[in-house]
Amino acid sequence: MEFKVDTHTHTYASGHAYSTLIENAKSAKENGLTMFCSTDHAESMPGAPHYWFFSNQKILPRFLEGVAIVRGVESNILNIEGEIDIPPSVDRNLDWVIASFHEPVFPPANKEAHTEALINVIKSGRVDALGHLGNPNFDFDFEQVLKCAKEHNVAIEINNTTLKGNSRVGSVDRCHEIAQIGKALDVYFTTGSDAHFCHDVGNLELVSELMDNLDIDSNKVITHSAKQFLSFLELRGRLPIAEYDEIRNA
């Protein structure tokens, strides 16, 4: 499957990534993307920036190197109540919010606690996607969470870095199972490189292989085209981004 959007990328602002936004944009262009989301870690993650960094993305151009730039964040799930570490006042300046578990922020607990946290995150209405769910340290009830995501139009991320097998060890088989259940439940999928260096932006080869093997419908993969991605944002209740009208109407 082909993807024109990468919804999970990091710059050096995340504290443990190594490229600038311009470098990421250049790589995105070289790798054939139409659009990518810049999603640095929110402030609870060690080394991550203050929330002002995310609020101030309003000053960013909508295109760099001819590639559309989506203003986003990878927020941290803080607790079983489903709170994330971005103040609600910042929401209006963001186009795309991922919520993820990270061990330094949410110490792994048990399946029930993780399930409750994910469901509450979804029901909060503040997040557009759940990130790298395959991590075995954060086991959860796949079917229960994915049903909730389907009901609330929250996308399920398939993460290329996870599928390499050397990060979040033990995730690969779980990612396949999550994708199979998601297909059966007709959820929306998104695809993220989780690039922490510019050369990885748009590297979604393993995600493509997984989706082809499972025969996932490209109409349910919001990153298959930039137009599909923008339609999903509107489905989520976000206002159309005027600068992307040409993409939307293509």
UniProtKB/Swiss-Prot annotation:
Q: Species name for this entry?
A: Vibrio parahaemolyticus serotype O3:K6 (strain RIMD 2210633)
GO BP of this protein: bacterial-type flagellum-dependent swarming motility
Gene Ontology MF terms in the entry = phosphatase activity; zinc ion binding
Q: What is the protein's name according to its record? A: Probable phosphatase VPA1527
Q: Which UniProt keywords apply?
A: Hydrolase, Metal-binding, Zinc
What protein family is recorded?
Belongs to the PHP family.
**InterPro entries found in the cross-reference section:** Phosphatase_YcdX_put, PHP_phosphatase, Pol/His_phosphatase_N, Pol/histidinol_Pase-like
Residues bound to Zn(2+) 3 are E74, H102, H132
Annotated binding of Zn(2+) 1, by residue = H8, H10, E74, D194
Residues in coiled coil: none
Q: Which cofactor does it need?
A: Zn(2+)
Task: Give the cofactor binding note.
Answer: Binds 3 Zn(2+) ions per subunit.
Instruction: Kindly indicate whether the keyword Metal-binding belongs to this entry.
Output: yes
Query: Which domain of life does the protein's organism represent?
Result: Bacteria
Instruction: Return the GO cellular component terms, semicolon-separated.
Output: cytosol
**Class of the enzyme per the UniProt entry, highest EC level:** hydrolase
The enzyme's E.C. designation: 3.1.3.-
> Is Zinc included in the keywords of this UniProt record?
yes
Amino-acid positions noted as binding Zn(2+) 2 in the UniProt annotation, renumbered to this chain = H16, H41, H196
